[in-house]
């Protein structure tokens, strides 16, 4: 796929994306777009971004050959891009550093964020502390219950965590509340969106901050094995870790790209979070147009995933576009497959992955045995699993 260019000047990736917000937010988004376009062309902005990624986040994150897991499965060699080793334990901080630098550049003193698994909330609270800003994090009440360690981490970092009791009490509702708050306090507040979704320019901006993942991986794989992987795979909720890995590979036609949605209890049940794989129609949510789980009246459907971070009814607009143009394959891993992959990575490699990332590992577990021993799968290990210990223990019937 040569000459890939997206989004267009209106923020559309094909027919997805755009700017579907109340009139009160248009000036704020235009201000943000202008500030980002200026920052994008300022070498000093990127120099500071790279400095913080190196000295504060600890980048580059390594690539690691999961040799024992590969041997156990028999087939393709599995390599992991270790985003779990970043400061705060996931890929989220790549984006929050970038957006916090932009907020400071715009003179904003307060940041707000939404969070599902709590990783983006922790990463936002972290950069707010780092740059001396106040921080409010909106989190669904159900997610607060399943992610208590991260809630406490956010509070330790000085953030105010606001529980959201409306709707499904998960990520979608947290995002609704954060957008409402942004409308009310747009003058002094910067909204750090945590995924490659939302109204333009967020999907492009988040991608640009996250593609450090794929850029590093390309150089590292070349050094490690003398070529690029046959397949690059990542889990997809809103899709920021996936677009960060995929974007630098889009024009590399010999690298197959696979996005793994949350299959929950199966896409033939209502209990999943897989808009593309389940064939969901296009809809509008949180200011952008994309494939969206909805009923015949356009009402957003409930979702289910064992991982809070994938529990979202929509998907970032660039992913919908990459599906439409057939550059990326989207598929699912079910809850039980993700849990099996979680166990395998713990036992064979001594790495406890996030349940989100376990969905990508599950694809490798399922497909590596069907591939040749000389083939290579690169899995984006987007986060570590400390936050999921309680969830996994509960599912195994273990009292902690």
Swiss-Prot record:
Keywords: Amino-acid biosynthesis, Aromatic amino acid biosynthesis, Lyase, Pyridoxal phosphate, Tryptophan biosynthesis. One of its GO terms (cellular component) is cytoplasm. It holds the Pfam family PALP. InterPro entries: Trp_synth_b_CS, Trp_synth_beta, Trp_synth_beta/beta-like, TrpB-like_PALP, TrpB-like_PALP_sf. CDD domains: Trp-synth_B (cd06446). Pathway: Amino-acid biosynthesis; L-tryptophan biosynthesis; L-tryptophan from chorismate: step 5/5. One of its GO terms (molecular function) is tryptophan synthase activity. Its cofactor is pyridoxal 5'-phosphate. The keyword Amino-acid biosynthesis applies. Its EC number is 4.2.1.20. The modification N6-(pyridoxal phosphate)lysine is found at residue 92. It catalyses: (1S,2R)-1-C-(indol-3-yl)glycerol 3-phosphate + L-serine = D-glyceraldehyde 3-phosphate + L-tryptophan + H2O. It comes from the Bacteria. Belongs to the TrpB family. The beta subunit is responsible for the synthesis of L-tryptophan from indole and L-serine. Tetramer of two alpha and two beta chains. This is Tryptophan synthase beta chain. It comes from Neisseria gonorrhoeae (strain NCCP11945). The gene is trpB.
């Amino acid at each position: 796929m040569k000459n890939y260019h997206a989004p267009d000047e209106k923020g559309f990736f094909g027919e997805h994306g755009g700017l579907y917000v109340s009139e009160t937010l248009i000036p704020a988004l235009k201000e943000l777009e202008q500030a980002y376009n200026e920052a994008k062309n300022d070498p000093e902005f990127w120099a500071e971004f790279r400095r913080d990624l190196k000295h504060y986040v600890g980048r580059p994150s390594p690539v690691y050959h999961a040799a024992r897991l590969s041997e156990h499965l028999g087939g393709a060699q599995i390599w992991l891009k270790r985003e779990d080793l970043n400061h705060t334990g996931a890929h989220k901080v790549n984006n929050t550093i970038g957006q916090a630098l932009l907020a400071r550049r715009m003179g904003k003193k307060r940041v707000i964020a939404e969070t599902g698994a709590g990783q983006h909330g922790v990463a936002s609270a972290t950069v707010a502390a780092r740059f001396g800003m106040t921080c409010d994090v909106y989190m669904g009440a159900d997610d607060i219950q399943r992610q208590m360690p991260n809630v406490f981490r956010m509070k330790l970092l000085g953030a105010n965590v606001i529980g959201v009791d409306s709707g499904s009490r998960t990520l979608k509702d947290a995002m609704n509340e954060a957008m409402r708050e942004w409308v009310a306090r747009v003058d002094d507040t910067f909204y750090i969106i945590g995924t490659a979704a939302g109204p333009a320019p967020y999907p492009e901006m988040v991608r640009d901050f996250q593609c450090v993942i794929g850029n590093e991986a390309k150089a590292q794989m070349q050094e490690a094995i003398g070529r690029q992987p046959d397949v690059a795979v990542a889990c997809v909720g809103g899709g920021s870790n996936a677009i960060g890995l995929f974007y630098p590979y889009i024009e590399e036609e010999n690298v197959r790209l696979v996005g793994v949605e949350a299959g929950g209890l199966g896409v033939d049940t209502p209990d999943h979070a897989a808009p593309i794989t389940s064939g969901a129609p296009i809809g509008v949510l949180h200011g952008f147009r994309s494939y969206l789980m909805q009923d015949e009246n356009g009402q957003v459907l409930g979702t289910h995933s064992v991982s809070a971070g994938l529990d979202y009814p929509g998907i970032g607009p660039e992913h919908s576009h990459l599906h439409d143009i057939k550059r990326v394959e989207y598929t699912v891993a079910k809850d039980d497959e993700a849990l099996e992959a979680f166990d395998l990575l713990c036992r064979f490699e001594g790495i406890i992955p996030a349940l989100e990332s376990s969905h990508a590992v599950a694809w490798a577990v399922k497909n590596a045995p069907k591939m040749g021993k000389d083939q290579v799968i690169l899995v984006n290990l987007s986060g570590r699993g400390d936050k999921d210990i309680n969830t996994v223990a509960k599912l195994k019937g273990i009292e902690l």
